[in-house]
A protein has these predicted regions:
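Bacterial N-terminal signal peptides that target proteins for export
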Residues: 1-8
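Hydrophobic helical h-region of N-terminal Sec-dependent signal peptides
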Residues: 10-12
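N-terminal signal peptide c-region/cleavage motif recognized by signal peptidases
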Residues: 16-18
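Signal peptide processing junction and immediate N-terminal pro/mature segment
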Residues: 20-22
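Short N-proximal segments of mature Sec-exported proteins
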Residues: 24-76, 90, 95
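A charged, solvent-exposed segment within the mature domains of Sec-exported extracytoplasmic proteins
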Residues: 30, 108-109
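Short, compact, well-ordered microdomains
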Residues: 82-108
């Protein structure tokens, strides 16, 4: 009896897990959806942070908060619905690169 109750509890808990807890490659549409949900905001923060942390070309200045980074990405997704079918990481990087462009290197002599 105890085993069947535990199994039923496990099955129910798996069904009620938020969908943003799943590991998957997401599109801009899905990330935009998460941007709109208050309870998914921590996911957005983590996602955007991972984009910045894994990019060799991110030029985010010191002092910029994770909230600011998430706002930039979420605003970009809101303003560009025609691009939201692309993968979210590429869109997030593009949004951050547009808002925080890297300084231009001097021309080689």
């Amino acid at each position: 009896m105890l085993r069947s109750t535990a199994m039923a509890g496990l099955a129910v808990s798996m069904l009620i897990q938020p969908d943003y807890a799943l590991a998957e490659i997401i599109t801009g549409n899905k990330l935009h959806e998460y941007c709109q949900k208050y309870d998914a905001r921590q996911f957005v923060y983590g996602y955007v942070t991972s984009v910045v942390d894994t990019s060799k070309f991110a030029c985010v200045p010191p002092g910029v908060s994770v909230g600011q980074l998430a706002d930039v990405v979420c605003r970009y997704l809101s303003n560009h619905p025609e691009k939201r079918h692309y993968d979210a990481a590429s869109l997030a990087f593009g949004a951050l690169n547009a808002s925080f462009p890297c300084p231009k290197l001097p021309a080689a002599k």
